[in-house]
Design a protein with these regions (language model features):
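Conserved phosphate/oxyanion-binding catalytic-loop motifs
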Residues: 49
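Asp-based, Mg2+/Mn2+-dependent phosphohydrolase catalytic module
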Residues: 1-15, 20-39, 52-75, 82-266
Length: 266
């Protein structure tokens, strides 16, 4: 395979399934990312995972050896959602259905976080949904009631699963599906991959023309389709969710199929 790295100046690089799976770090992938950086390539880490804030991702990346990363080098779906809502509608009263990282990003953008009591009296502007490891029956009920009462139903991302060292676990898309069933409504807005909003934010941060940008990820349904939706090339890494069998059966094909991130530099 030709040296792919020579063809691109900018990379939108996924994290889960590319640099790590849960607590298991892919050390060779870390080496590749650092090599790309040393070659002068621009990298923005683009992840649908909203459980951590951008600052928390910087901390994790530095801990595994990506010492050069800054907060502006990370775009996750929690940040993108909070930013987009503020820009489009101003600060909102938000019921956050997710983990601490989502709460942080919403507050940093000036949104007011409200609790379940507000959902039952219909005084919520938006229910923002990410992956929530503490989801309960009553939390689903409160969020669904707010949505039925007129709150915007906003999904940070549609990922039904995400890779861990133990295998696939339920993702934000699973939470979204539960709220669709409970509220009888579809999301008013989905921000994360494969949808355009998160790519547009990431591209503005990257600052490189599209023809010189490569999307690198482990999912056909978000990374590859998302890249196609915004006119970007894509590389699918087989260290996460997608399998070669799934790629062969899919009508949507990535530009490159990599057994590991190492092949970017081969």
């Amino acid at each position: 395979m030709p040296d792919i790295a020579e063809r691109y100046e900018g990379y939108l690089m996924d994290l889960d399934g590319v640099l790590w799976a849960g607590q298991r770090v892919f050390s060779d992938a870390v080496r590749v990312v650092n090599s790309l950086h040393s070659l002068g390539k621009r990298i923005v880490f683009l992840t649908n995972n909203s459980t951590k804030s951008r600052a928390q991702y910087v901390e994790k990346l530095r801990k595994i050896g990506v010492d050069w990363v800054r907060e502006q080098d990370v775009v996750n779906s929690g940040f993108a959602t909070a930013k987009l809502l503020r820009e489009q509608r101003g600060p909102l009263k938000v019921y956050p259905f997710g983990d601490v990282g989502l709460y942080v990003e919403l507050m940093l953008q000036g949104h007011r976080l409200v609790n379940e009591d507000w959902c039952w009296v219909g005084d919520v502007d938006a229910v923002v949904v990410g992956m929530d490891p503490g989801v309960t029956y009553w939390k689903i009920g409160a969020a669904a009631n707010a949505i039925r009462a007129g709150a915007d139903f906003v999904a940070t991302n549609p990922d039904r699963t995400f890779p861990t060292e133990r295998g696939l676990m339920p993702g934000a898309g699973t939470m979204v599906a539960a709220l669709e069933a409970a509220s009888g409504k579809k999301p008013d807005l989905i921000v994360g991959k494969p949808y355009k909003p998160i790519f547009e934010i990431a591209l503005s941060v990257l600052g490189i023309e599209k023809s010189k940008v490569l999307v690198v990820g482990d999912r056909l349904d978000t990374d590859v389709i998302g890249a196609r939706n915004v006119g970007l090339d894509s590389a699918l890494v087989l260290t996460g969710v997608a399998t070669l069998k799934e790629v062969e059966a899919s009508q949507v094909k990535p530009g490159y199929i990599l057994r590991s991130l190492n092949e970017l530099l081969v």
